A protein has these predicted regions:
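Flavin (primarily FAD) cofactor-binding/catalytic cores of flavoenzymes
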Residues: 2-65, 133-631
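Redox-cofactor-proximal catalytic regions of oxidoreductases
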Residues: 54-132
Length: 633
């Protein structure tokens, strides 16, 4: 197609696979390819394409500030398949991140011999032990490592894979961005930003988040001439352009905001110091160059902190949900609202009652068995009211779902209202195993993955997917995928230092000649800088990059249809992850994995967790098998 880079060009002579994106998924695909081959296999060339650091990828680059931390715990992430995994190629046992840290410290007698042997055969770069000395010494399984340290782990895994490649696999590294893909008969021609071309018999796109084109409001923001920090991952945003010493408006109170908060306080020389007299437990000592944040979001309330258990989080029983999944697995047109949500909600309230009975048994005014009978007989939206007369500490999940809805006070009053709730959030998170509220919320949070698997590939009704399911997934994100506790303590310390204020939920924006104005209910605030501290979901229908537009224009992808309604994800074939054309035919060579396919496949943003048969590693294994099948056909 003229002008799109999708035209037809001449032939090719050698079998080759192109992996676009050399972060965790790209690494895993290379390892899964290697697991399927040996020195005597027919030779192939694998082109490794990414303008970011190969192995780490953009998000986990090792040269970034150590101020930013993972949202995942050290003992809950791996990149190696494990014995018993649902994969076709042989397993390569390797240390999870925390075991790798233990081995760096000279510990790990309880780590399996196979993992220790792999580590000893491939010792990490010597600078890691020195550069991360303090962090390595302090890290526990439940710690949140710096993103840079996780990048070092990924780079080590990548180096292990490269070193262990059979002689039949040769690799070529390209440190450039893919711009377009053209079909040339039986091959793909990938044009890179540096002007080079890669010719491939099979291609996989494993590139993570892709930014869509600006919507109408964002086009106005871009044309305003004012200081607007557009939505993106914080490592891609120009946080240095956020001015210190003046008001800054923010939209977003999730992980993106917490990153921006850290980068404009700690990274600029401010300090959070322990202070037992402060309600957050911290006192902020300003550097003078931090912004004065005025913050809003869809809910208007900050993401909740993760609990501190002193160990990895517990696995909740969720007995009702497990029963529902066993009954409904694979069934089309499941109504999430009517058939799944009641089990999730009742499991959550059972977790509350069970923990309350354990830590404060006198709080139950009726026997636990009687309360559970009421839970099972009550509409899920009425559970809080139903159990209230039976306990001395009533709790209603609805209060958290709509924490500031209808609040009519001014910014000062709302800020204090939220600050008091944050103080409670901090207290509950610090209680760990002994918080009934956190037990209830963790039960709901852990229900998200199995519920999303149950409804994958459009198995939930369209109405329930866009309704209750979407609501529950969003709420679960806020209560279960929030920051480490220390980040929420830091935000409350900023509130008490007069440097963070809350505007409210569902803000509306107006653009004036010299400032922006955000309004939420009766509250409004103006400033010359607006930070959008969130990320849009990738959407191939409104792609902001030439490569995705090229694929759409050339008919190599189509939106995944959810009950006839197009979504933002490219549709892919389950067994192979090959893309689907508008006419329903599978593409001969092109594969897409990971985050962009969120509408069709579950759990696309979650790192592989040890002991869970991670879906990401199942996907990369399937994809590697298909890539080899394509080049050998």
């Amino acid at each position: 197609m003229e002008g799109s880079g999708c035209g037809t060009i001449g032939g090719m002579s050698t079998p080759a696979i192109a992996i676009v994106g050399m972060g965790p998924r790209g690494i895993s695909i290379l390892e899964r390819l290697s697991a399927r081959m040996d020195d005597s296999s027919d030779p192939i060339t694998v082109h490794l394409i990414d303008d970011a650091q190969h192995g780490a990828g953009r998000i986990w680059e090792t040269d970034q500030t150590k101020t930013l931390c993972m949202n995942t715990r050290a003992g809950a992430v791996t990149l190696f398949t494990e014995p018993g995994s649902t994969v076709d190629a042989p397993v390569l046992e390797g240390p999870i991140q925390y075991e790798w840290i233990q081995l760096l410290r000279g510990e790990g007698d309880d780590i399996s011999a196979a993992k220790r042997e792999l580590f000893e055969q491939h010792p990490p770069a010597t600078h890691i032990a020195e550069d991360y000395r303090e962090e390595l010494a302090a890290t526990r399984p439940e710690s949140n490592p710096s993103r840079a340290l996780y990048g070092e782990y990924l780079r080590w895994v990548y180096d292990v894979i490269i070193t262990r490649l059979p002689k039949s696999i040769s690799t070529v590294s390209h440190f450039s961005q893919l711009e377009t893909i053209a079909e040339d008969g039986p091959v793909d021609v990938l044009r890179l930003a540096d002007g080079s071309e890669v010719r491939a018999d099979a291609t996989v796109l494993a590139y993570g988040w892709m930014v869509p084109e600006y919507n109408e409001q964002e086009k106005q923001l871009a044309a305003s001439g004012l200081n607007w920090i557009a939505p993106n991952n914080p490592v891609e945003q120009d946080y240095a352009a956020i001015p210190g010493g003046e008001d800054v408006l923010v939209r977003g109170l999730g992980m993106g905001f917490y990153d921006i908060m850290a980068l404009t306080t700690i990274e600029r020389g401010g300090a959070f110091v322990e202070d037992s007299s402060a309600r957050s437990g911290l006192r902020y000592e300003p550097c003078g160059d931090e912004p004065n944040f005025i913050i809003s979001s869809g809910r208007g309330y900050p993401y909740h902190p993760k609990s501190e258990y002193g160990e990895l989080p517990p696995t909740m029983p969720r007995r009702r949900l497990k029963k529902v999944i066993a009954e409904l697995s694979g069934i089309q047109d499941t109504d999430f609202d009517a058939q799944v949500w009641p089990a999730i909600a009742r499991d959550s309230y059972e977790a509350y009652i069970t923990t309350l009975e354990r830590v404060r048994p006198d709080s139950l005014l009726r026997p636990r068995a009687d309360i559970l009978e009421v839970i099972d007989a009550t509409d899920p939206d009425e559970l809080g009211a139903a159990i209230a007369p039976m306990v001395t500490e009533p709790w209603d999940m609805n209060d958290l779902m709509y924490q500031i809805a209808g609040f009519t006070g001014d910014i000062v009053e709302l800020t204090e209202h939220i600050a008091q709730s944050m103080e409670s959030d901090i207290r509950e998170a610090a209680a760990g195993h002994d918080s009934p509220i956190k037990a209830a919320l963790w039960s709901l949070s852990q229900s998200r993955k199995p519920a999303s698997i149950l409804g994958a590939e459009g198995r939930y009704t369209r109405e329930s997917r866009t309704g209750r399911y979407s609501q529950v997934m969003s709420f679960g994100q806020m209560i279960g995928s929030g920051p480490p506790l220390f980040r929420v303590r830091q935000l409350l310390a900023l509130v008490d230092a007069g440097l963070a204020h809350f505007l409210g939920d569902h803000p509306t924006l107006s653009i004036e000649a010299d400032h922006f104005t955000l309004t939420s209910g009766p509250r409004s605030a103006s400033a010359p800088t607006l930070v959008d501290a969130f990320m849009h979901r990738p959407d191939i229908r409104t792609a902001g990059d030439a490569m995705t537009r090229c694929l759409v224009d050339s008919g190599r992808v189509r939106p995944f249809p959810d009950h006839g309604q197009p979504t933002g994800s490219p549709e892919t074939d389950g067994p192979t992850r090959r893309t689907v054309h508008p006419d329903g035919e599978l593409d001969a060579r092109l594969h897409i994995v990971g985050i962009p396919t969120y509408s069709q496949w579950p759990d696309t943003t979650i790192s592989p967790m040890p002991g869970t048969d991670p879906l990401m590693l199942q996907e990369t294994d399937k994809t590697a098998g298909s890539l080899l099948a394509v080049v050998r056909s």
